């Protein structure tokens, strides 16, 4: 997505040190959103290219030099602050030259992404942090798993967590609500020890009861009924989306969305596939991280990222 019309193109630099911590700057008194924390950067000057503009801003604000070729695209966030919209274009850097120090008297802090309190960030910067926290793959349990397979699937999910899967949706429609909650509770300590998140499908009350490390993935139908974010910022909320309208609603209710189907699927043969071009258009117009779902495999995560995705979500090929 390019900055057009009345949209202000703003660059944000995500600086990560060798400990994995990211740099945040506090907005000064007297400015819009004073006191909130944000990723350093600033707006493009007329005729300026995005990455050179970011390099200039980081030098002016922090006294460092970054090379545009060292930047990695993270996420682009269209955001509306009142009358004027902005496109917040976030790039990640792990290398820079010079001594980093505030050049404008601003407060700075280094924090691990998972330790940042999202409520202290400027609203448009929150999706940047979620993009840093969220993994490239999102595994969803098969819908045909029977309740008498609880032991087998407890083991499979535990093995997935131990081999590095960090985001798993427990979508088990043939199970009772209580059976799914019990499985999540049994897996909760292991997930916490690996900084993994388990998401219940639809079950907002269950996620509230189980607490830390247990989130919820809401359906497109649930999005229509929600008036506010269903869980605290400390618990993840995902949303199922199929079009631009649903993505727009999910921005203020969820931390991320799945967008489907990208490719034809046997489970939903009646739904036309989006294809990568349409997926990219929708994902880049959305102000939150979006996973590609539908006909996806873990090996396609890099391809998905080239088309504006956070990564890929899937069912069969992830187990």
What feature does the model see in each segment?
Residues 75-100:
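Active-site-adjacent beta-strand/loop module that shapes the phosphate/pyrophosphate-binding cleft
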Residues 216-229, 256-270, 295-319:
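Glycine-rich phosphate-binding active-site loops on the catalytic face of alpha/beta enzymes
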